[in-house]
């Protein structure tokens, strides 16, 4: 293909699919898997929504794009308007570049998408960010908007690059506050949810309670690492959960209420099903225009969700598999082959370079692209394009979390995962309010003994229960990995670390 159309679909808070129960049907996702190439060891670079999305759309690591916080308020970090995004790269190449759905890289309801290189955006981005019921409410109109755009422009003469940002399965964050049975049990929560969702100015206005679907019973067993008490893990894992639940106490699930935790997993499945219906609407539009012969489709997520693994919920300042390992499917006519799979390590930072290459961009002239090309994996799914993936996170999120070492940097080589935790104080919280203290203590250049450390052997310990960094007999190994990571950071991150 010369200058193919490119359809880029990003879901929110969706982990890699090997946890899904046997017998579950997700026909739209399965269609992509059956017709293209699945990457099973694909990782996000960072866990918060906005930093992860900044990496997707710039091809840069967090140290370069500097979006360290969710871009929810003007005082939080945002993607600079002069950032070189995929929209700008492909527009310069003669592409029509459009965007539908969640953006979350500017702290306002109507982001200046033209400044980021994208046209035809509609909606209220603050409603897409992920308040209770947002995915259930908005994914269908987002998908319909995208499908209408495809039908209107899919056969235009100029090539196009359309990005669609779906919200679900992000709604898992709010379980059980958005469940009608919970409203009946806890009627005082109704007022909170009503206030959360009653001021929408885009979408329907009659969705209280926000979720009315029945939940099928899929799970009888909790995750294998559910009982991890986290006392051998970096302090921030417990501190973040305590901070989150201190702000939202109605999200606290009784650790002994097994059925509630299982229902959470069932809800996560249901949100995948609803998201898949929205994805199907977009694929149907591609069928309607007969657009598959000259269109590349890429589906991924920004990050995953713990959903009870390690006794944790949501995505936080940790680098566990459930949060960091995410889906990636590609269907590229004449490039990928049906029902193929690659188990090679890939990173979200690789996607921008790969998409730009698909569009014919001379990536050698774009030094800001820090990822690797994934093209060798199209020919040989066993090829090795990188020796490791890098993780980074520098946000305390909730009051109190800034008092421990909340920032982290890490690497995973396919077997061993090592992460260093540093940083006390500095930054802004989830509402854009400044934490006490202007400077981060024990910062990026802190000495080895001023860190919390974490190391796992995933071949021997796939559930990441045994923190080898606490084994005094392995102290030399941990120190060596710390030095290796610091060396890589100085080579890869031009802005320091």
What are these regions (language model features)?
Residues 13-22, 155, 166-294, 298-345, ...:
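Active-site-proximal cap/lid insertion segments
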Residues 18-25, 38-60, 99-110, 165-170, ...:
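Short, solvent-exposed turn/loop segments enriched in Gly/Ser/Thr/Pro and often Arg
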Residues 105, 179-180, 320-322, 395-469:
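C-terminal, low-complexity/hydrophilic appendages and adjacent surface loops
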Residues 18-19, 43, 72-77, 130-136, ...:
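Active-site rim elements
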Residues 15-19, 48-53, 64-67, 99, ...:
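Short catalytic/ligand-binding loop motif for oxyanion handling, primarily in non-cytosolic enzymes
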Residues 26-27, 56, 102, 143, ...:
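Polar, surface-exposed loop/tail segments
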Residues 55, 60-160, 167-193:
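Catalytic-site neighborhoods of secreted/periplasmic enzymes
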Residues 1-40, 46-47, 463-475:
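Active-site-proximal N-terminal segment of extracellular/periplasmic enzymes that hydrolyze or transfer
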